[in-house]
Amino acid sequence: MNSLVLPLCLLALFGFSQGELLVTKKVYFDIKIGNEPIGRIVMGLFGNVVPRTTENFYQLCTGQNGYGYTGSKFHRVIPKFMIQGGDFTKGDGTGGKSIYGAKFADENFQLEHYGAGWLSMANAGQDANESQFFVTTVKCPWLDGRHVVFGKVLEGMDIVKHIEQMPTDSTDRPIEDVVISESGAIELDTPFAVDKTGVGADEEEE
């Protein structure tokens, strides 16, 4: 019996089946459109695959360093592609700040943009990660190997889809402000597995 303990522990720590990933941290965004609260997006992060990227996003969600996502906006929305946010320094997609004090390197490209509901780092080129991120609304294989995937939407994909459908201007900025009114962490007692699939039955596969 004891001979089974170590393999089972290793399985729990480092993953389940080949088609699953282990969520090690949970975070949330409470969203407002204008002054109207519309709901919460809950996201799972993969700290065993991309620990530095996960920690950056986690600490920016909690605001434990005195800065982070609370009060920032989704500044770029493209239907059948993604919604982008995380620029809490300038608010227009030209700013951002990581917990590491500078842009940090692409950690790895082990994870792919498997479908709708995946979190990935926005960047201005190779090894240029700060705080900007995006949430996919379709499968995006052309981004694999270029943007670091680090999380998945667990709850609130309907909120993501609502944002995706909002009217935008010529720069893809929502006409009405989409604000992260509050962000933070959700206690996670035990890591759990999620599938490498898109979120939502109506996901586009293009």
Curated annotation (Swiss-Prot):
Gene Ontology annotations for the cellular component aspect, listed alphabetically: cytoplasm; extracellular region; intracellular membrane-bounded organelle
Entry comment describing in which tissues the protein is expressed: Component of the acid-insoluble organic matrix of calcified layers of the shell (at protein level).
Gene3D superfamilies (alphabetical): Cyclophilin-like
Keyword Transmembrane helix: no
Parts of the chain that traverse the membrane: none
Record InterPro entries: Cyclophilin-like_dom_sf (IPR029000), Cyclophilin-type_PPIase (IPR024936), Cyclophilin-type_PPIase_CS (IPR020892), Cyclophilin-type_PPIase_dom (IPR002130)
Keyword annotations from UniProtKB, A to Z: Glycoprotein, Isomerase, Rotamase, Secreted, Signal
UniProt keyword Secreted, yes or no: yes
Gene Ontology biological-process entries: protein folding
Glycosylation sites: N129
Catalytic activity field: [protein]-peptidylproline (omega=180) = [protein]-peptidylproline (omega=0)
Subcellular location: Secreted
Enzyme class of the recorded protein, top EC level: isomerase
EC number: 5.2.1.8
Residue pairs linked by disulfide bridges in the UniProt entry: none
A Gene Ontology molecular function term of the record: peptidyl-prolyl cis-trans isomerase activity
Residues annotated as signal peptide: 1-19
Residue stretches making up the PPIase cyclophilin-type domain: 28-185
Family of the protein in this entry: Belongs to the cyclophilin-type PPIase family.
Function: PPIases accelerate the folding of proteins. It catalyzes the cis-trans isomerization of proline imidic peptide bonds in oligopeptides.
The protein's name: Putative peptidyl-prolyl cis-trans isomerase
Organism annotation: Lottia gigantea
